[in-house]
Swiss-Prot record:
Hydrolyzes nucleoside diphosphates with a preference for GDP, IDP and UDP compared to ADP and CDP. In the lumen of the endoplasmic reticulum, hydrolyzes UDP that acts as an end-product feedback inhibitor of the UDP-Glc:glycoprotein glucosyltransferases. UMP can be transported back by an UDP-sugar antiporter to the cytosol where it is consumed to regenerate UDP-glucose. Therefore, it positively regulates protein reglucosylation by clearing UDP from the ER lumen and by promoting the regeneration of UDP-glucose. This is Ectonucleoside triphosphate diphosphohydrolase 5. GO terms for biological process: 'de novo' post-translational protein folding; protein N-linked glycosylation; UDP catabolic process; UDP-alpha-D-glucose metabolic process. Coiled coil: none annotated. It comes from Ailuropoda melanoleuca. Glycans are attached at N232. One of its GO terms (molecular function) is IDP phosphatase activity. PANTHER family: ADENOSINE/GUANOSINE DIPHOSPHATASE (PTHR11782), NUCLEOSIDE DIPHOSPHATE PHOSPHATASE ENTPD5 (PTHR11782:SF35). The keyword Secreted applies. GO terms for cellular component: endoplasmic reticulum; extracellular region.
Length: 433
């Protein structure tokens, strides 16, 4: 099945359509991704490889894709993926950039073991950093990227220009949407029936879908719409990336840590944490002390779902655009949506499952009102589930009954933007045997 959908994915360039993507009044980074000039001509049968690093806020992941061109002159098909990851993410090495680059070097060894030596020199390697590095001061982020470039330069793989960069948030959303809808067969022929995508990272979150109503297009803020053509059809996507609204960034906002200048010696407390808890947490290279509300403290000292939800609600309420159309739409959700659902047995960790938005609220109530029982694995479980509930309902405006397909993989291929980015990479380089 993966091969079949992989073939469908690569049919994207078969039509060789001009696909300039633009915001309402300007061209943007996506211009030329699927241009006809990228269609390979007279290629011979071969096996192709592509290496894509996803440098997220909580970890660095490597995706090694194998593509096979079985018949000369035909576009290659996706045959398989190797996936590995390391923690923490590059942003945790904000003051030790060389050490951060060493984590990338460690994953490159996986690529060496996976890609035949004879293919190393023509296998491209690229790293795209996401919200974790976007949140860092520019000079700090560039120091990390420089060290990664040095690692790549010494590697035996093909290193394209701009091989190490920070990716625009909307780039994540669009490529994830394309990946999911191609792997599920939603974009075949002239069908406009697609699924939306929700990605919840550590530092940012993305929402992308194809609006079905003119009212949505008319009421959408400037910069949230992106148009492109494929299969002789025009798709105008609603897509936006919210920096600072990822799961772990939201923890800091909920705790009030983002509003505190001096954090040394300060313990941040929350109704979302058990009373007995006193701990520390490192995010983005910064150490935070945190704990539960204490009885008798200033304030209510309450714990449980209701006071917790009031805290996370302040993080999202009135800060995200709410397109009415999403209330009746279906979405694929992945990353931390998937992880927290799996952590609480709402879905199977390997196969995923289907949930309604209200299922997250029900589980959040269960966890938060029984904090002593549910915090052995993660003391933030109550806060995370409550935040996800608030993000979906009060942030994006989803209805309780909205259906979410929780998926880590589609047809055995990881969801997310990495496959789409690798596809673009191979085509833009015109790589063939």
């Amino acid at each position: 099945m993966a091969t079949t959908w992989g073939a469908a994915f690569f049919m994207l360039v078969a039509s060789c359509v001009c696909s300039t993507v633009f915001h309402r009044d300007q061209q943007t980074w996506f211009e030329g991704v699927f241009l006809s000039s990228m269609c390979p001509i007279n290629v011979s049968a071969s096996t192709l490889y592509g290496i894509m690093f996803d440098a997220g806020s909580t970890g660095t992941r490597i995706h090694i894709y194998t593509f096979v061109q079985k018949i000369p002159g035909q576009l290659p098909i996706l045959e398989g993926e190797i996936f590995e990851s390391v923690k923490p993410g590059l942003s945790a090495f904000v003051d030790q950039p060389k050490q951060g680059a060493e984590t990338v070097e460690e994953l490159l060894e996986v690529a060496k073991d996976s890609v035949p030596r004879s293919h190393w020199k023509r296998t491209p390697v690229v790293l795209k950093a996401t919200a974790g590095l976007r949140l860092l001061p520019e000079q700090k982020a560039e120091a990390l990227l420089f060290e990664v470039r040095e690692i790549f330069r010494k590697s035996p793989f093909l290193v394209p220009d701009d091989s190490v960069s920070i990716m625009d948030g909307s780039y994540e959303g669009i490529l994830a949407w394309v990946t999911v809808n191609f792997l599920t067969g939603q974009l075949h022929g002239h069908s406009q029936k697609t699924v939306g995508t929700l990605d919840l990272g550590g530092a940012s979150t993305q929402i992308t879908f194809l609006p079905q109503f003119e009212k949505t297009l008319e009421q959408t803020p400037r910069g949230y719409l992106t148009s492109f053509e494929m299969f002789n059809s025009t798709y105008k996507l609603y897509t936006h990336s919210y920096l600072g609204f990822g799961l772990k960034a939201a923890r800091l906002a909920t705790l009030g840590a983002l509003e505190t200048e001096g954090i040394d010696g300060h313990t941040f407390r929350s109704a979302c944490l058990p009373r007995w808890l006193e701990a520390e947490w490192i995010f983005g290279g910064v150490k935070y002390q945190y704990g539960g509300n204490k009885e008798g403290n200033e304030g209510s000292g309450e714990v449980g779902f209701e006071p917790c939800y009031a805290e996370v609600l302040r993080v999202v309420q009135g800060k995200l655009h709410q397109p009415d159309e999403v209330r009746k739409s279906s979405f694929y959700a992945f990353s931390y949506y998937y992880d927290r659902a799996a952590d609480t047995d709402m879905i199977d960790y390997e196969t995923g499952g289907v949930l309604k938005v209200e299922d997250f609220e029900r589980k959040a109530r269960e966890v938060c009102d029984n904090l002593e029982k549910f915090t052995s694995g993660s003391p933030f479980l109550c806060m995370d589930l409550s935040y996800i509930t608030a993000l979906l309902k009060d942030g994006f405006g989803f209805a309780d009954s909205t259906i979410l397909q929780l998926s880590k993989k589609v047809n055995n291929i990881e969801t997310g933007w990495a496959l789409g980015a690798t596809f673009h990479l191979l085509q833009s380089l015109g790589i063939s045997h």
